[in-house]
A protein has these predicted regions:
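Active-site-proximal, glycine-rich beta->alpha crossover segments in alpha/beta enzymes
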Residues: 2-67
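Acidic/histidine-rich catalytic cores of soluble enzymes
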Residues: 49-125
Length: 125
């Protein structure tokens, strides 16, 4: 973080979507103005097998996020870096056994309450 700050980067956008990050089921659907857009349809993945990591619970993700925030936010404060957590995309309960926790306003309030700091924020995407 210190090196990022030295070169003028003052915000780090990160996500809490292990294994399967941004997921899409279609990458070329027609959109407005003849644009091609990505989409996600839960029906297309709901019966797919779990990943090789099996089931990852919300409890585990919250424990890991709490550990991360308590370790990293103080360093961000020292470095003058702002952390911005990206919402889960798509905002579904789980994908192939991997839970999603950053899907609601209440979840972001909980995240902010774990380590209240102006350096602990969210990405508006």
């Amino acid at each position: 973080m210190k090196n990022l700050k030295k070169v003028g980067i003052d915000t780090i956008c990160y996500n809490w979507m292990p294994v399967i990050s941004w997921d899409r089921t279609t990458t070329d659907r027609p959109g407005r103005g003849r644009a091609r857009v990505t989409t996600f349809d839960y029906e297309d993945i709901k019966d797919k097998a779990f990943t090789k990591y099996g089931e990852v619970s919300k409890v585990t993700l919250w424990k890991n996020l709490e550990y991360f925030l308590k370790a990293v936010v103080p360093e961000a404060e020292k470095s003058g870096i702002k952390l911005a957590l990206h919402p889960d995309d798509p905002q579904v309960d789980s994908i192939r056994g991997i839970s999603r926790i950053m899907t609601t306003a209440d979840a972001f309030r909980r995240m902010a309450d774990i380590y209240p700091s102006p350096n602990n924020g969210l990405t508006m995407c």
